[in-house]
């Protein structure tokens, strides 16, 4: 009996010591890049339903010159207003992925990049150039943007 107890305790200990499977961070980084590309296309086409699929319910967005947006409702309201703004030529919007880092655990990542969009002004069309960072979290097996912040370069 004593041998059985020792055997089972050893099995339990060894099972607990089994390392978690190694995450392929390169593949996960590629997933994040592809999500950012899909998000760019959704912005270009003003597809609000698609845009909203990229955010987690508690997502925080730090938009230039506005109060911090928290949660899907406030983020969606902001995108609706932005897409309705006829001075913003959304079909010209672009995002360039500069750097992607995925945590070793594979559940958190960030991406930095640059964005461009043409804007109508009283003096003609100007290029808005900016930069930003999105933080992604894997929730129930899916990557969702939990924090985004961006601003413009000096124009």
Model-inferred region functions:
Residues 1-26:
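Bacterial Sec-dependent N-terminal signal peptides
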Residues 17-54:
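Short, low-complexity N-terminal intrinsically disordered segments enriched in polar/charged residues
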Residues 21, 129-154:
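Short beta-strand edge/turn micro-motifs at domain boundaries
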Residues 26, 30, 48-107, 112-114, ...:
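A solvent-exposed, acidic/Ser-Thr-rich amphipathic alpha-helical stretch
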Residues 55, 115-117, 149-152:
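Short beta-strand segments enriched in hydrophobic/aromatic residues
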Residues 117-121, 136:
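Beta-strand elements of well-folded, non-transmembrane domains
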